[in-house]
UniProtKB/Swiss-Prot annotation:
Keywords: Amino-acid biosynthesis, Arginine biosynthesis, Cytoplasm, Lyase. Gene3D superfamilies: Fumarase/aspartase (C-terminal domain), Fumarase/aspartase (Central domain), Fumarase/aspartase (N-terminal domain). The keyword Secreted does not apply. This is Argininosuccinate lyase. It comes from Actinobacillus pleuropneumoniae serotype 7 (strain AP76).
Amino acid sequence: MALWGGRFKQEADAKFKFFNDSLRFDYRLALQDIDGSIGWAKAITSVGILTEQEHQQLVVALKELRAEIEPNIAIILRDDAEDIHSWVESKLIEKVGDLGKKLHTGRSRNDQVAVDMKMWCKVQAVVLQERIRNLQHKLVETAEANQNAVMPGYTHLQRAQPITFAHWCMAYYEMLERDFSRLSDAYKRMHTCPLGSGALAGTAYSIDRDALAQDLGFSIGTRNSLDSVSDRDHVLELLSTASISMVHLSRFAEDLIFFNSGESAFLELSDRVTSGSSLMPQKKNPDACELIRGKSGRVFGALSGLLTTLKGLPLAYNKDMQEDKEGIFDAMETWQACLEIGALVLEDINVNVERTREAAQQGYSNATELADYLVAKGIPFREAHHIVGEAVVYAISKREPLEALSVAEFKQFHPVIDEDVYPILSLESCLEKRSAKGGVNPERVREAIEAAKVNLGA
């Protein structure tokens, strides 16, 4: 039976009922709905709506219901209730009879769903931080194992300067650290409890909303009932953080796809995270990484969709807000899966250090070192930049790397260039010179790895 049937003389059309009902997706809020109901039972007992005996009966029944569904909440989908609130109430009435009908006193589904969603978002934030930490651990482990893997760094997808695979890993560690921080910030703003706001104007019963908030794991009750039932900022913040993180994961995946390709051959992905072709027997496709890259779009879409849904809504609750759920449920599941698969990809990754070094020695990625060499000889950088550009053009014409040019050839471009130029053109010198904080100098990279391990508690 619908929770609102008294006003209506006709049954809802079956098509409208399916269109309107939300149990098929909001069943995911079952545990939060039950926990919120336990908290609400205590609150209305404190103002005399329930006796202590009735309160205990309801709590026992609600806890029984929670225990029944917790192993597999999808069993709820066998029923045909309008939404998760209706389902919980109907099951409660089955257990305790008419007493179950008293629980909703002073409460609206508007503040009920608001608290359910916020509680669910809090759980998700914690779970996702755990998944981020796991991927960060894998990145640090991979970095530590590949500190000597010199490879080209890229700008515009052209070889730019030598880096190490460890430095590359730590770049993504830093991106994920910001994602972790954004979740922490979002979580702080989830500390207020909307339950007790009623439909929009507040509850008619003088419950202690701050005590209720603390019972449900919040810090304090919200300050404005109208805002409380209308607020979905916590959903938007999670979707925004997920979208930014999926940008990072997509770039991570794209880099690995490129490094794994036959054209680069910098590394090989494990058989455990790749698949074959139904036609071409030789193929080993980086499907795990391609799916991470591809799934970013659905997360971005969830954020865009909810922003569009909310932007024109008048206060307070509108049924449009039911559209907050499917997007966030899917986005959080997708984000979590991508973090988990990203960690799995790194478990058995095999870096070809000979190939990465060979590639780093190509593409004139030591040209900047030659410019810095000239600067050290007293030549202004802009002039040095031009001189080295000419030297690179000359080396390209000879199909030789810069370090293969003779001193006499170098002196065509400037007389200050001498025998001491060759040591600075080595890959090791290129790395060593980048010794400022955050640079690719091996010692700086080691320090970054150690700092990350401390941060992760490793």
